[in-house]
């Protein structure tokens, strides 16, 4: 396949890139039993696939009404924010709570447009320098939350 075709952003190219990324990820984690290393590897894989510099796991604590960043992967040279973001009040993120209950992703593609509808959420992301975001929900037994990718640069149309 020519380089020109592979540079296009077609469903075939996206699927092929995803398959390659999953193969590399599976090979690197195949013999790992350390759950922290596995989660870090998955976050790194997600960030690299989407061309992002940071990916994290945000878990919901329904009893306390907060979101907690439990894992974070950052590209070299990017400052970690996990320790600063331990008790995210759910009332500032009503859209996220609704999306999680409906098992739907959260997408931020335009921070200015978001500010008109969800000003607290937009202010939060602006404060931390995030301008776009993709977040996919997960639910496993008692844990629920999102795997989030900050400022993705590739495959953002899906």
Question: What are these regions, as identified by a protein language model?
Answer:
Residues 26-33, 42-61, 100, 125-126:
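Short regulatory alpha-helical segment in sensory/regulatory domains of signaling proteins that mediates
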Residues 131-139:
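A short, aliphatic-rich beta-strand micro-motif
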Residues 47, 56-98, 104:
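GAF sensory/regulatory domain recognition
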Residues 97-106, 113-117:
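Soluble sensory domains of the PAS superfamily and closely related sensory modules
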Residues 63, 138-144, 152:
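Flexible loop/coil segments at beta-strand boundaries within sensory signal-transduction domains
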Residues 2-12, 115-119, 145, 150-158:
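Regulatory loop-to-helix N-cap segments in sensory/regulatory domains
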Residues 109-132, 151:
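Signal-transducing coupling segments at domain and membrane junctions
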Residues 1-37, 48-49:
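Signal-transmission linkers at sensory-effector interfaces
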């Amino acid at each position: 396949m020519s380089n020109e075709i592979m540079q296009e952003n077609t469903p075939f190219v996206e699927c092929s890139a995803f398959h390659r990324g999953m193969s590399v990820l599976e090979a690197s984690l195949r013999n790992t039993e350390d759950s922290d290393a596995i989660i870090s590897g998955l976050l790194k894989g997600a960030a690299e696939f989407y061309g992002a510099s940071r990916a994290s796991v945000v878990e919901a604590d329904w009893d306390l009404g907060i979101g907690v960043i439990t894992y974070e992967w950052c590209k070299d040279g990017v400052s970690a924010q996990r320790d600063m973001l331990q008790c995210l009040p759910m009332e500032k993120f009503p859209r996220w709570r609704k999306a999680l209950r409906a098992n739907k992703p959260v997408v931020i593609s335009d921070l200015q447009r978001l500010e008109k509808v969800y000003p607290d959420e937009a202010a939060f992301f602006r404060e931390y320098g995030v301008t776009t975001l993709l977040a996919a929900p997960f639910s496993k037994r008692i844990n629920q939350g999102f795997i989030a990718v900050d400022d993705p640069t590739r495959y953002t149309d899906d």
